[in-house]
Amino acid sequence: LEVFAREHGLKIGTIADLIHYRVRTEKTVERVSECTIPTEYGDFRLVAHQDCVDNELHLSLVLGEISPEEPTLVRVHMQNTLCDLFSTGHNACSWPMRRAMKQVAEAGRGVIVVLRNHDTTREIIQRMHDLQLHDRSDPVPPRDASPAHLRTFGVGAQILVDLGVRKMRVLSAPKSLHGISGFDLEVVEYVDCR
């Protein structure tokens, strides 16, 4: 592709370049409210962001001062009604919200972004089935990521940037985050669930 572009005098842009351009020209997330909320892990700043595309409200818990120069402990958490509401430590629930809050509190500063979604009846029943399968030691089948689910990565990234995060210590299993540099974000470390 690079040879073809050179031969025909064309410019090549990366996915990160495209994302960077769109973030500068098309902001789709807006901070709409903020307050202090006491939790069992201390007082966090609760920040609400409105997604202008689907009108969804996403929430973030921020602890301490966030500096773009310092790596920040970060968890981007997809809301899961069953796992979050009942605080289960079940392995089918991925990383428990309370555990992420505890780790951020122990670190003294960090950000937890909760990307909200409205679980349908079918999705809740499927998650209940996954819990039952996992109890029997059967593998939980992977779910294909829908285009809407994939879009949430960009929403989470915009929220992190708005909160002042640039370098991240991510509370998650390692994963490939193509184009994250287009948001001026950098993953410096993945932190295991304790």
Which sequence ranges carry the predicted segments?
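Catalytic domains of riboflavin
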Residues: 1-194
